[in-house]
Amino acid sequence: MSDVASQIIELRPILPFAYARSQQILLLQRENDASLQTICVAQTPPAALLEARRIAGCSLRIERVTDEEFERQLVISYQRDSEEARRMMEDIGNEMDFYTLVEELPDSDDLLDADDDAPIIRLINAMLTEAIKNKASDIHIETYERYLLIRFRVDGVLREILRPQRKLASLLVSRIKVMAKLDIAEKRVPQDGRMALRVGGRAIDVRVSTLPSNYGERVVLRLLDKNSVKLDLELLGMSERNRQLLDSLIHRPHGIILVTGPTGSGKSTTLYAALSRLNASERNIMTVEDPIEYELEGIGQTQVNTKVDMTFARGLRAILRQDPDVVLVGEIRDGETAQIAVQASLTGHLVLSTLHTNSALGALSRLQDMGVEPFLLSTSLLGVLAQRLVRTLCSDCSQPQPVDPVQAEQMGIAPGTLLHNPVGCPQCSFTGYRGRIGIHELVLINDDVRAAIHRSDGEMAIAQILGGSRTTIRQDGLNKVLAGLTTWEEVIRVTKEE
């Protein structure tokens, strides 16, 4: 390593990498005397310099460098020094930081030609560690003509992390395919796999998806951190009313309960929390899933396998011969599965499942479109929970401000009402948000709604029947805005179809 690189690594960066890169500014603190140094380029926005000064709390010594020099110093300067990061890096036997490892990797274009693939393994371990530390749900590895792009999805939003040298693409992709037991020679078709890892002493399930593109394969890693999942209804962010109503529904002896929402809206977590609540020695609880995301002790879990014709419908039929009390169907995707689920609920089983619809009432028409007769649906359905995930405000930097009249009118609140707004600080990577919380709409199927379903009434007619007893998903979001948990912009972002 060069003397200049060694000197830079002695400096600890204060700003998150993504912010430092996008604003082209480095705020560095020397380890031994805590002095600060700022490195930027000619195009660095004045606002970024002011933000660096605000964070530092003092005047700064600014050094302007060329774009090329800034990129080099950006990569080699990022050392993670938190206790958690050090512990996790030690656990995986990795003495260097993710960004430094990228700089230090050997110049090899083909993993199969390398005598030692330990450096690339360390890089993947460091990348996974970095993703877990940032609470990322997905890692995107994208190959373009001139560069390789690595992005993390954090709190539902993609965030650029690093642009390593282009030649690392084949190294990373090949090694990941080996770890996921995929065919490394096959680069023409998409492949799916999974791997179970321990990173920093934590059990991580990783779903791997590869896709050919015009400049090489793209890879997406879905991270399932078994230590971070909240399998408790009281920890899902539901209002007290919705939580109590859902708790009463799942303790009914038979019927269907559905959870709806787009991909990544937390449906599986809600269902797992419900199963954990019901899990007891006197109940036989069984699931059919695609895939099994989290293993639940005391619950029989079966995974769909289309290669051997093990579909949701076939798995559900087999489960019903296993004397179950409660059945979880990971997703109702077709009419056959829907019909079997309805029949199961009518023969003394409690059935939990998910549907990809935008609203709770949309689940009713979707099931009828799948061929479920209205009289069967009205008899079997207990309730539908629609949900989304919104980012929560960072508790370290959010600030209350009076809402302007235009937004107040949109929200239906009094002008001047104090609402918390995102600001941005190092704790939240300058996004203003940290973590996510659910917003929900729970529709209970009462006698009036059953009669409407039996008559094949539309969603609007059923909404009128529910009237004021129904709290829509957007109204629940507004309640969380008023409580200072999130922002109206976040609620609108995830409920645009409302």
Curated annotation (Swiss-Prot):
SMART domains per the UniProt record, alphabetical: AAA
Its subcellular locations are: Cell inner membrane
Recorded GO cellular component terms are:
plasma membrane; type II protein secretion system complex
User: Which cofactors, by name?
Assistant: Zn(2+)
Q: Which PROSITE patterns match?
A: T2SP_E (PS00662)
For biological process, the GO terms are: protein secretion by the type II secretion system
What is the protein name for this chain?
Type II secretion system protein E
Species: Pectobacterium carotovorum subsp. carotovorum
